């Protein structure tokens, strides 16, 4: 399970008791490995989730959100990896969400990490820039323990290298996986029609299926690219695609050069779209932009642009401590708010993360159970005509 540290699955930091309860229930319901990351690589935002996974005997895999910039040196990565191991992580994932890790850089990084920590190293990348298979090859030769792949119908583009290709690449070598290619072919054949359906329906956009070398210039992750394409379509501004791509690294620099991974990728991307469509930079800022520049998401590797920060948040106080230290426990309050809908413990967490969607779902679930028509029900007063 991919887990956004203190942000869990959402876009804001939650109280420690909510994080701990979510980890506990995830493991109780069958999750075994929790990949925990933070969009700032701020380890303060990871410690609660890691300790909770340790307590419940789950596998805590902590991700390094890989990115480029003069602050992101080998010394930076090895230092943070050592601290992650000391924190109690069971393994480390190099999370290359934008496909920026080049083959020979992968050799350097994996070699340095293997010399620094004893826990296993997993490499996760995307094919957006077209180099992912070569990056995996060099990483495996350098000693990486795990690589993440996707079955061929859903591979390449903003996804991962194809499983079948990597299996065949290493066949007959010391890295042979032993996987049966015939069985993999059966799996691929099963999913191929679904790919075609997704393309025909528009659920998958052909724009994100190919190689985009501009990724290496603008450092845009696959998920962020998909989101940006969708935002521009909604605004009938698809012609602004290249302008937004050029704006993204400028916004990222203003924001202290964070790695572009959820939620920072969406915050930077949405702000870049606003800057381009409004015709003036930071004329309009999202609430998430204001929160980021206020330190609510944690510490960035570089300082914010002071002029941009002043324009966006004015004299708002900037957080310098661990953001979650300012959030009182909220689990009891959340349970009290939704107690009329609670049928199982997990409902509390659904409501905590997605209150509006959860409430709509709870109403629908109850209607199905009681065989009532929600269009006739007075849900506010819990009344129904007879």
Where are these regions (language model features)?
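Active-site beta->alpha loop and helix N-cap motifs at the rims of alpha/beta catalytic domains
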Residues: 1-85, 102
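Short, well-ordered coil/turn segments that N-cap beta-strands
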Residues: 30-33, 56-60, 88-90, 117-121, ...
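Glycine-rich phosphate-binding active-site loops on the catalytic face of alpha/beta enzymes
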Residues: 36, 96, 142-159
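Catalytic cores of alpha/beta
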Residues: 72-84, 129-145
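Core active-site phosphate/anionic-ligand binding loop and the adjoining beta-turn-alpha structural block
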Residues: 134, 159, 167-170, 177-234
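Terminal or standalone catalytic/regulatory effector modules within metabolic enzymes
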Residues: 205-215, 219-386
């Amino acid at each position: 399970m991919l887990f956004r540290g203190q942000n869990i699955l959402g876009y804001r930091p939650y109280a420690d008791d909510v994080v701990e309860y979510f980890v506990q229930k995830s493991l109780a319901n069958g999750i075994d490995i929790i990949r925990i990351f933070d969009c700032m690589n701020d380890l303060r935002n990871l410690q609660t989730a890691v300790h909770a996974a340790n307590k419940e005997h789950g596998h805590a895999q902590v991700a390094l959100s890989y990115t480029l910039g003069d602050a992101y040196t080998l010394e930076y990565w090895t230092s943070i990896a050592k601290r992650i191991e000391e924190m109690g992580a069971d393994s480390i994932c190099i999370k290359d969400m934008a496909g920026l890790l080049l083959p020979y850089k992968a050799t350097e990084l994996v070699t340095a990490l293997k010399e620094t920590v004893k826990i296993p190293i997993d490499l996760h990348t995307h094919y957006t820039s077209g180099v992912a298979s070569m990056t995996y090859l060099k990483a495996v030769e350098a000693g990486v323990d795990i690589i993440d792949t996707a079955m061929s119908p859903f591979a390449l583009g903003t996804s991962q290298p194809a499983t079948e290709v990597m299996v065949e690449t290493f066949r007959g070598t010391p890295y042979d996986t032993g996987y049966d290619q015939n069985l993999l072919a059966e799996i691929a054949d099963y999913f191929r029609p679904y790919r075609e359906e997704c393309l025909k329906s528009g659920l998958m956009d052909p724009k994100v299926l190919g190689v985009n070398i501009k990724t290496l210039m603008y450092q845009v992750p696959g998920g962020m690219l998909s989101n940006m394409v969708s935002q521009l379509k909604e605004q009938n501004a698809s012609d602004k695609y290249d302008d937004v791509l050029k704006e993204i690294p400028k916004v990222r620099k203003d924001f202290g050069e964070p790695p572009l991974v959820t939620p920072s990728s969406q915050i930077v991307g949405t702000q870049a779209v606003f800057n381009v469509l409004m015709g003036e930079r930071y004329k309009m800022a999202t609430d998430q932009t204001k929160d980021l520049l206020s330190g609510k998401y944690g510490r960035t590797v570089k300082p914010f642009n002071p002029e941009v920060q002043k324009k966006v948040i004015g004299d708002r106080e900037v957080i310098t401590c661990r953001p979650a230290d300012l959030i009182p426990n909220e689990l009891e309050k959340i349970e009290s708010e939704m107690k009329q809908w609670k049928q199982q413990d997990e409902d509390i967490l659904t409501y905590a993360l997605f209150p509006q969607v959860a409430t709509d779902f709870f109403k629908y679930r109850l209607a199905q159970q009681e065989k009532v028509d929600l269009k006739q029900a007075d849900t506010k007063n819990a009344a129904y005509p007879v």
